[in-house]
Amino acid sequence: IERAGLEPRIVTIPFDTPTPQRFALVQSSLDQACARSPIDAVFATDDLAAAEVLEWARTRDLSVPGDLSIIGFDGTETMRRALPHLATIRQPISQIAQAAVDILLEQMEGTLPRPIDEAGESPAPTLEFPGTLIPGRSLSA
């Protein structure tokens, strides 16, 4: 985004927003964002949010990907079946789960080495798991 000289606009919907209010909040937030300047792409934090953006675009007669590109984040089998055309980043859920279990077991057994930082804290380990782009028809070139 930075290399393209674009400045992202971040729209935040609280995670614990009940489903009936969530979609209305997504719609009003995107409407407000578009009132300031056009939106040409949305990177949703999960595939359900991306589905809500797709519905918002449909109700505003926006073409996806012509007018708006949308990509989600999850790539779960359920969402892939429901929205096979949605571009998404698939998380390696089994690897994440296995690493979480391994860390938990090491903590329970007391075998997890935890470095102490300058503040005397023992921060949790940082693990990175590469996602996989699942291209769909919701992205323009």
Language-model regions, residue ranges each:
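Bacterial carbohydrate/catabolite-sensing allosteric modules
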Residues: 1-141
